[in-house]
Amino acid sequence: MAKWTKFPHDNSGFQYTAATLKKNWARLHRGDCEPFPKDDAVVQAWIAFHAGDFEKAATLGLAAGPDGHNAANKAICIYANYLEKSDKKKLELYQEVGERCEALQAADKKNANAFYLYAYAMGRYSQGISVTKALAQGLGGKVKEALTIALKLQPKHADACIALGAFHAEVIDKRSEER
């Protein structure tokens, strides 16, 4: 993996131990409804994520196997969206997350965040190649379906609800530009 840009802000308020992460988990994951991990290695990945150490979170999450993939995928998506400077690298990262999410969906059909993070990654990928091109490749339907499944699995998944609304708004906006 190429060198990652470090999180540029003070993160001292987000330094957690396993115990303090568990205590704050519901507040930190209100939007994505991610369940608190059972595996200590995955807990460490989430500790790194919340501290803004996205590279470490990705590395630890991937090393933990499928149980750590939501932490890794979220870390990679947030990193790509906010810190990665290369558009080409962003697209590569989003594609990698999308592929990993598809495998995770097949292995665990009840993992709402495997569907949500797929939609996030492919939605951002679509924006990078242009929404019109993405729709032509069928990504629009796949993103919408993934968000719909995430919401069926976890109706209180606020992030998926917001993303589905944004998806509809962007598709309508792009379609109206074409006319």
Go through each PLM region and give its residues:
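Conserved alpha-helical positions within TPR/SEL1-like repeat arrays
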Residues: 116-117, 162-163
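Short, structured loop/turn "capping" segments at alpha-beta junctions
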Residues: 156-161, 175
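Conserved small/polar residues in nucleotide/adenosyl-binding loops
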Residues: 178-179
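N-terminal alpha-helical interaction modules that lie
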Residues: 1-115, 121-128, 132-154
